């Protein structure tokens, strides 16, 4: 298994954090790529190197949350 590059992980984390922050301020359907990259202080090229669109970053965040929540439930209930 190949480990992801540290700069890739850092960029993706910055983009995800920016999206989460923005989602607390405005409706998710109104968040744009420009909003995310401005908040993350990264370029649009960096965004598109990792995600095809804003919906994909939202889905990734949701899927990770669900996965972690299910793991938590498994550990606490069984």
Where are the regions a protein language model picked out?
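Primarily secretory-pathway and cell-envelope proteins
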Residues: 1, 44, 76-78
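Basic, helix-initiating cap at the start of DNA-binding domains
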Residues: 1-22, 26
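Alpha-helical structural segments
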Residues: 13-21, 39, 56-76
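Helix-turn-helix
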Residues: 22-55
């Amino acid at each position: 298994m190949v480990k992801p590059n540290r700069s890739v992980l850092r960029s993706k984390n910055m983009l995800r954090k920016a999206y989460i922050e923005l989602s607390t301020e405005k409706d998710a359907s109104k968040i744009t790529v420009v909003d995310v990259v401005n908040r993350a202080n990264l370029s649009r090229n960096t965004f598109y190197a990792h995600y095809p669109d804003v919906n994909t970053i939202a889905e990734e965040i949701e899927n990770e949350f669900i996965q972690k929540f299910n793991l938590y439930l498994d550990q606490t209930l069984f």
